[in-house]
Amino acid sequence: MARAKFERKKPHVNIGTIGHVDHGKTTLTAAITMALAARGGGKGKKYAEIDSAPEEKARGITINTAHVEYETESRHYAHVDCPGHADYVKNMITGAAQMDGAILVVSGADGPMPQTKEHILLAKQVGVPNIVVFINKEDQVDDIELIELVELEVRETLQRYDFPGDEVPMIPGSALMALTALTDNPKIKPGENKWVDKIYNLMDIVDSYIPTPKRNIEKPFLMAIEDVFSITGRGTVATGRVERGVVKIGDSVEIVGLGATKITTVTGLEMFQKTLDESIAGDNVGILLRGIQKTEIQRGMVLAKPKSITPHTNFEAQVYVLNKEEGGRDTPFFSGYRPQFYVRTTDVTGKIESFCTDAGEPIKMVLPGDRIKMKAELIQPIAIERNMRFAIREGGKTVGAGVVGKILK
């Protein structure tokens, strides 16, 4: 079947929901899609369609990163619903890297919780430039002063992690009340329901506060591979978000990392089940590759313009080590420590060979809450470059978040 062509009529922005488990991220995502669908901006999605992680559905915890799309009058959005549960921060790290801005969901009934803080820190570390806050469950709070207290607390937390706490917009509302109204009447009009209007208000603020990103189109093409599958008779497709540059059908690309670098040709491009002639930075796309077997390519490798990025194992980095309250370790670690390094879409075991303070003074051990400069060696080469962000994990905990300062080997 011939695919419809994807039309670029509006600027495209990648956003997502972050925040503590059960504060209402997925409910809000569903409410946004249904509210905008009522105005003609895409198809509404029900909670169950977004929360489609069958193995965890029973516990109501979202594990897989769900992608939905919708439109406001001025923009087209791709929205990732990031996992809220601490064990699934791994997905947050690959998911949050796909955001030009985030909607931080905080329950007005509970205020900021440990994962709220962990997600704000991770958003900072993975380079989410802007945050808008939705104070959810307003219908469960009788006293307006409690909402104001929650706002104050969220602003202080944002400030602590270098977001402009004073200017970040805060919108109170109830995702569940809005979703219930939209489920009862999918054609509801603006002005007919105060809870639905708060969702429109939120999206107006997202439109105006989160700047249309300046895409890295001028830079050489790079896409981190998230998934790989075969299409019978056509070949192997790699999917992911184009991090920078432009790729066209017929271009040569290199497959870099986790093995010998290979070169191949792009024979097809698809986005949201529609074909493209070219794909640009910011697109979530499937790339059909000539002559590549599914076994030769895997999540964690990157597709890149030939000779633009090389695989490395040794680097120096600035790292913030999470304290116990942020979900990190409660004991120190020493040189020779071997955690997992999460880079773009991959995790690789590495060894922390040595470290010193930010100022360069030698230290014997690293305590939770420290900021350090360190040297690391990975067991497999992956595509690494200066200023690239990564996370350090161990046994389901985020131990630290860092940025590459210097490539050593």
From Swiss-Prot:
Residues the entry annotates as binding Mg(2+): T26
Family classification: Belongs to the TRAFAC class translation factor GTPase superfamily. Classic translation factor GTPase family. EF-Tu/EF-1A subfamily.
Key words of the record: Elongation factor, GTP-binding, Hydrolase, Magnesium, Metal-binding, Nucleotide-binding, Plastid, Protein biosynthesis
PANTHER family membership: ELONGATION FACTOR TU, CHLOROPLASTIC (PTHR43721:SF5), ELONGATION FACTOR TU-RELATED (PTHR43721)
G2 as annotated region, ranges: 60-64
Segments crossing the lipid bilayer: none
G5: annotated segments: 174-176
Start and end residues of each stretch annotated as G4: 136-139
Gene assigned in the entry: tufA
Spans annotated as G1: 19-26
GO molecular function terms noted in the UniProt entry: GTP binding; GTPase activity; translation elongation factor activity
Biological process terms in GO annotation: mitochondrial translational elongation
Record-given protein name: Elongation factor Tu, plastid
Enzyme class: hydrolase
Keyword Repeat: no
One Gene Ontology term, aspect cellular component: mitochondrion
Organism per entry: Prototheca wickerhamii
Subcellular localization: Plastid
Lineage summary: Eukaryota, Viridiplantae, Chlorophyta, core chlorophytes, Trebouxiophyceae
Record bears the keyword Hydrolase: yes
InterPro entries in the record: EF-Tu_GTP-bd (IPR041709), EF-Tu_GTPase (IPR050055), EFTu-like_2 (IPR004161), EFTU_2 (IPR033720), G_TR_CS (IPR031157), P-loop_NTPase (IPR027417), Small_GTP-bd (IPR005225), T_Tr_GTP-bd_dom (IPR000795)
Function field: GTP hydrolase that promotes the GTP-dependent binding of aminoacyl-tRNA to the A-site of ribosomes during protein biosynthesis.
EC assignment: 3.6.5.3
Binding site residues for GTP: 19-26, 81-85, 136-139
Catalytic activity: GTP + H2O = GDP + phosphate + H(+)
Signal peptide range: none
HAMAP family associated with the record: EF_Tu_B
Major localisation: plastid
